């Protein structure tokens, strides 16, 4: 490959990464704004984040986690 082609490819990769990093930052700000809006309407943001995390688990893992949590709560009388 010629140096010109390599330089152009590198510039394209860098440009794409920069664009995606900016999009990621923009999306992160949008998510933050949504949480702030939900909070201002009385929703518990911490609970919402927990729900989002739980939704990512498959049903078997979620059931296992729920069972373990219930066992620990019962053991500790909570």
Swiss-Prot record:
Membrane-traversing stretches: none
Pfam families registered for this protein in UniProt: GapR_DNA-bd (PF10073)
InterPro entries in alphabetical order: GapR-like, GapR-like_DNA-bd
Signal peptide limits: none
GO MF annotation terms: DNA binding
HAMAP family: UPF0335
Similarity comment text for this entry: Belongs to the UPF0335 family.
Protein known as: UPF0335 protein RMA_0160
Organism encoding this protein: Rickettsia massiliae (strain Mtu5)
